[in-house]
Amino acid sequence: MKTVTLPSGQTVPALGQGTWKMGERRDRRASEIAALRAGIEVGMKLIDTAEMYGDGAAETLVGEAIAGERDGVFLVSKAYPQNASRDQLRRACEASLKRLRTDRLDLYLLHWRGSVPLAETAEAMERLKASGHIRQWGVSNLDADDMDELIAAGGEGCATDQILYNLVRRGPERTLLPWLERHQISAMAYSPVEQGKLLRNPALGAIAARLEATPAQVALAWVMRRDRVVAIPKAGTVEHVLENRKAVDIALSVADFATLDASFPAPRTARPLEML
């Protein structure tokens, strides 16, 4: 499994598992748990969730899925911005830990920026780190100017920025990804196949056919081409998660990258960070 190195020096799988909208339907619960467990077995040991997902339902499902496997999983969750204050963040974290059936998070993120000052959130995160509730912390959906402000406000401990990034959302390549590279901060790409919407593209399909792969696998391989980017697709079935895993083994050629650049051109000017 390809890995990404965090600022701490710790390595994590370049291909993880997302959980948005998991745990919300009883008829899919067994399948979703089986998918997460299958992903762990094949090396996709980074699992990303959030208190927002199903109002905690995804965290509860993840807690069940990783029972007995906690030490082998890199567990990520995210806090609502309204819970990112000095007083609220500890309570939010402890509620997430209870749902996840664990005593610590490997990485805890601010889900998006709200009204709480970044300096206060950074301080609250460092307190959770000191108390052992979390091992590392980061942010999500923050653009380069936000990251500048975060670092200036005492947020040097930020380990990652989780962002919307895929073939049709290449805006981060203009400013944000270079900023993260300069500061040796990793990125996590959520919705790396745009919820399946980009998979009918003819160019993507042609490359997939030549490689005896699926368009989704090619799209994931494209995201993982960068050394500091972790892709976190969601898969609700064992079959789907095993299909995603094969993306790690795909080697795209220079010609493939050129074809994808022509079909999915990067923006020529900077644009605000998009989010879902």
Language model segments and positions:
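N-terminal binding-site loop/beta-alpha segment at the start of enzyme catalytic domains
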Residues: 1-73, 265, 275-276
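Beta/alpha (TIM)-barrel catalytic core signal, keyed to glycine-rich beta->alpha loops juxtaposed to Asp/Glu
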Residues: 3, 113-276
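Acidic (Asp/Glu)-rich catalytic clusters
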Residues: 6-7, 41, 63-71, 94-103, ...
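Short, well-ordered coil/turn segments that N-cap beta-strands
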Residues: 11-15, 43-46, 70-73, 102-106, ...
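Active-site mouth loops of central-metabolism enzymes
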Residues: 18-30, 77-87, 111
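Short, acidic/polar
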Residues: 26-39, 85-100, 145-148
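A short, structured active-site edge motif that brings together acidic residues
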Residues: 71-84, 107-111, 141, 164-165
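Active-site groove signature of glycoside hydrolases
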Residues: 97-116
